[in-house]
Structures are given as C-alpha cells and as structure tokens.
Amino acid sequence: MTKAQKPESPPIIKDNFSQLSDKINLKGQEIIKFISKTLPHKPGVYQMESDEGKILYIGKAKNLAKRVINYASLNNLTRRLQRMVSLTKQMNFFVTNTEVEALLLECNLIKRHKPRFN
C-alpha cells in the first residue's frame, strides 16, 4: 500500500440487545454482565439506555468487553454511576477500527444526544 492509499474503514457496526433484554427481563448489573460476555475486544463506543429508551450515558473504550464489564462491579463505582447502572435496561455498541475513531464518534454522539450521566 502506498502513502497515497488509505486503508478503508469498515462500517461501524451497531449491536442492539433490546429485543434480547426484553425477553430475558434483565436490568442494571445483570444485563451488563450478560451483554459483556458477547462483546468484542475491540475499540468502540457504548450507550446505556433506560426502560424508556432514553440514552443515559455514552462512553468510548479501546476494548469494549473489558470496559463494559467494569460497570458490573458496583463496589468500584460512585453512587452516581451505581444509579446509572441500575437504570440501564439495554445497551448499544458501535465497533470502530481505532481509538481515534471511537473518540470522534463518542464526541459526536454526546453532542447530539446530551445524555443525563455524561
């Protein structure tokens, strides 16, 4: 590949677990533990949503699986974050190629949605 050629970025993949979380009726710490088992060890952005579908928080990670599982350990979280986790009914994920892509996407999504816990 020459300098003039840039590697193509694959499309951002959005994984939505809302249908699954409705069927198994998990919320908060339990849904986070359940979902984290299926996440890739890749950079990306994650969204936590409430029962009503409101976005509570948007964050980025260089490793989605490792970052998201941290929310399942409530003892290590502030009360504010514990509250956010308890309100979480579903999560959405955007897998990116690089941390820089994740950072840019996170910034754009936060500006657009203005989540309560950001």
What are these regions (language model features)?
Residues 2-118:
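Acidic, glycine-enriched active-site microenvironments
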